[in-house]
């Protein structure tokens, strides 16, 4: 299982979805690391979409799981886009770990997206945050945003976001 709009975004951008299902255990879902690495190699994967924590299964990935996944992606030069919109919704006894905070090499190979929409129930304001630690990648991202015509900021969304986080 995965958040279904991921596949829609992939299709809308004329990209091909390479699916590696989670492994369903008796008590929790786990990541199929071997399957992911095999798919990366066999399918020439260049971008990995990570749902951290996972939606809809609710798994909060451990630091070791995230590092293992990151190590695989770094080894094969795969960019990780970590959707961390549900970071504030974790089970008691668990702690969300921001992917970019795992260390410099992980930060250099990722984009982290967050939003106040889930936590504060303000999805209608259509605002999100994109964190790109890698300067070169950030410049490329900004260039693509400009090229696509997203030059106008949502003023109400920014005010709502700022108020929610205060």
Task: Identify the function of each model-found stretch.
Residues 109-166:
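PLP-dependent aminotransferase class I/II
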Residues 8-10, 72, 102:
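Hydrophobic/aromatic ligand-binding patch that stacks against planar heteroaromatic rings
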Residues 15, 75-79, 107-108:
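A short helix->loop->beta-strand "cap" motif at the edges of active sites that frequently abuts
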Residues 6, 69, 99:
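Aromatic/hydrophobic pocket-lining residues that form π-stacking "cages" and hydrophobic walls in ligand
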Residues 18, 81, 111-113:
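Structural detector of well-ordered beta-strand residues that form the stable sheet scaffold
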Residues 1-17:
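Substrate-binding/gating loop at the entrance of the active-site cleft, primarily
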Residues 22-94:
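Active-site phosphate-binding strand-loop segment of PLP-dependent enzymes
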């Amino acid at each position: 299982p995965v958040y279904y709009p991921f596949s829609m975004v992939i299709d809308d951008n004329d990209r091909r979805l390479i699916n590696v299902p989670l492994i369903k255990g008796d008590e929790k879902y786990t990541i199929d690391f071997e399957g992911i690495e095999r798919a990366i190699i066999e399918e020439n994967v260049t971008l990995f979409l990570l749902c951290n924590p996972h939606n809809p299964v609710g798994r909060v990935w451990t630091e070791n799981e995230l590092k293992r996944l990151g190590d695989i992606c770094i080894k094969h030069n795969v960019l990780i886009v970590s959707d961390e919109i549900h970071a504030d919704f974790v089970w008691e006894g668990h702690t969300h770990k921001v992917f970019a905070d795992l260390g410099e090499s992980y930060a250099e190979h990722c984009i982290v997206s967050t939003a106040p929409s889930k936590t504060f129930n303000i999805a209608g304001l259509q605002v999100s945050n994109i964190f790109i630690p890698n300067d070169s990648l950030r410049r490329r991202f900004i260039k693509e945003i400009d090229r696509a015509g997203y030059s106008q900021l949502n003023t109400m969304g920014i005010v709502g976001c700022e108020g929610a986080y205060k």
